[in-house]
Amino acid sequence: MNRCRALVAQQARAFAEQGYLCTLVDFFGTGDCDGDLVDATLAQWRDNLERTIETLLAEQDLPLVLWGLRLGALIALDYAAQSDRTVRDIVLWQPVTSGKIYINQVLRQRVASLMVRDLPPETTKEIRQRLADGEHVEIAGYTLAGALAADIEAIDTSRFTGLCSGTLHWLEHVVEEGKDIGIPSRKLVDQLGESHTVNVQTFNDPPIWQIHERDEAPQLLALSRELLA
């Protein structure tokens, strides 16, 4: 996600120009935050969010808007589902729809990396067992422990009700203009739509979260600015 930081910072500045107090959260063990990822838990990350929100609301009592990218989007939804705070809107960029699927994708990165480096192969099942046994696993330069992986996999999207009083904005990448969002996304959007106002928008900028080169996403930025104008 490091390659997304410049894009996220650019959008944060745009939100600030629109009058929002905007803070980017580095969760425990990530970015510039203290601690190591191997010691992180989802409970700590929820606490990071809560403390950040407390600080912002102490500065100025404004409506609360949550914004997240990929796993951060799923964590924002999870926080809103558990918090007693009133959230007005939630902005989701290319949201992860399942913690279990996300962890599977992360583990596959290790499988692919071992293959490319001609190292002894592992399967996702074997990596899961290592994590369950208390081992730490290196993936893409980060060290993952079983506790955080289990926490993320256990996020229960069926509890995602009463998340916000306003609109849940779902922004998702499509290969071609006019295409619908993916099937897993559509299922979760339909579920959320039973109890929320959901605004689905698509964009076809480069998928910055998965490409190696730094790039721009002008369509995504423009859509996001319009949402909270």
What are these regions (language model features)?
Residues 13-16, 23-25, 188-191, 221, ...:
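Terminal, non-globular segments
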Residues 67-76, 94:
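Gly/Ala-rich beta-loop-alpha elbow adjacent to hydrolase catalytic centers
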Residues 86-225:
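The alpha/beta-hydrolase serine catalytic core
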Residues 57-71:
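Alpha/beta-hydrolase fold nucleophile elbow
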Residues 30-61:
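Catalytic nucleophile-loop/oxyanion-hole region of alpha/beta-hydrolase
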Residues 78-82:
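Active-site signature of alpha/beta-hydrolase-fold catalytic machinery across serine-
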